[in-house]
């Protein structure tokens, strides 16, 4: 199978007086696993339905390999979509469900049998060919829905939160399977989800949406490590947001004064001048925590505080540290063998925290 290149050009869509898509533009590469991530109601499913042909638009265009498909009906587009409920035919077997689109194309029985058997092998469900959908688990139904969607050899596969109805463990297992399947078939996957972990774990690139607009597009690393604004910083993962004022401008850093924290250095990634007010983000896992004082010659940004709350998560412990000047800093400490000999940090312990100035950076220069 060969993936298609999808271009969405300045697409706007209204439902009555409500604008659900606001001049949306995206370029999705051939064979890419591309995720559209955002909260409920942000327009991501509507955008998927526009690509599939189930929704019209007020303005803009949708192109596949450089040619507009906007005026093509859904059945004429080389695109298939998988919905949240999989939409399997309950009265047909697994084999018959996968064969259904091939029968509509009036292929010969030999061609249908060959293609369906190839797809059953691809999803590793040869032994379930004669089962009814009611006899399948949620994960098996999802695989059958994917196989049926691939039967017509689409250029693009659209997936509308296909794992949302599954439990967390199965969801993670099937996400890995989906990623492996994408690698094997080579077509373009466009995956819609509100789950940040899903999007950043399997995608080549991610588009972050909010209120009908594209906020940021980039690799999972880029959107997590370099969020472009407050929404991007807070929607993907957790963070500490700190208001601060620039008190000194250095070559690489700003020295800032933050209420409830004090003075610290942050990375100079946006232009600001002395006296400007900033909003700064710092991921909790970037912060080191210890009951011992850090050597000042080795680190910047050292603060003292008391553990207000601790939450043991298995792979890490989440600490909420009340600093001497009042700010409560979220600090996530990963568990590893090499730190087992360190004193265990508990509730009400006095602690020191520190972070590299490169890990705290500006998400917004606030207006006066």
Curated annotation (Swiss-Prot):
It is a peripheral membrane protein. It is an enzyme of class 7 (translocase). Part of the ABC transporter complex PotABCD involved in spermidine/putrescine import. Responsible for energy coupling to the transport system. This is Spermidine/putrescine import ATP-binding protein PotA. CDD domains: ABC_PotA_N (cd03300). The keyword Transit peptide does not apply. ATP binds at residues 38-45. Residues 6-236 form the ABC transporter domain. It catalyses: ATP + H2O + polyamine-[polyamine-binding protein]Side 1 = ADP + phosphate + polyamineSide 2 + [polyamine-binding protein]Side 1. InterPro entries: AAA+_ATPase, ABC_SmlMolc_Importer, ABC_transporter-like_ATP-bd, ABC_transporter-like_CS, Mo/tungstate-bd_C_term_dom, P-loop_NTPase, PotA-like, PotA_ATP-bd. The complex is composed of two ATP-binding proteins (PotA), two transmembrane proteins (PotB and PotC) and a solute-binding protein (PotD). NCBIfam families: potA (TIGR01187). The keyword Magnesium does not apply. Its main location: membrane. It holds the Pfam family TOBE_2.
